[in-house]
Amino acid sequence: KGTVIALTHRPHPGVVKRCEAFDDIIKEYPDIKLITEQHVPAEQPINDAQDIVANLLTANPDKDSITAVFAAWDEPAIGAAKALQEAGRDEVIVTGVDGNEQAVEMIKDGTNLKATVKQNFEGMADIVCEQMDKYFVGEEIEKGEMYAPAELITQENAQ
């Protein structure tokens, strides 16, 4: 149960997939209300997200008015966490995606940024190499989407 702000960048193919998954999942939880989805430009996502969230906090000053921020990648999550920290809104949780170093450090430090999903680049490369190897030896390659396992990073396992 709660209210969520989504920070997105739908022009990016990878980010749009995350946003579509978020859209599908949030529909399954009628007690979670999406307050707004805000487009974050790719050029300065930390600063832009910080400004966006600061403005949303001003417009929604009550403690229960915003309970979470979904950021479709880590840089806006970092900006959101900074805005929340400056506003003294420790109760709002932030999540991101990518597992970048700054985000993991903020998670370890116990900020509002509580989780990120770390991409498995080695696993992705393994899938690509396996498919190329099959192609080169004349075997049938897999069709459709393939997924490498990803890791949820929280304060308990952040390194």
Q: What label would you give each PLM region?
A:
Residues K1-Q159:
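A residue-level marker of the well-folded mature domains of exported/periplasmic proteins
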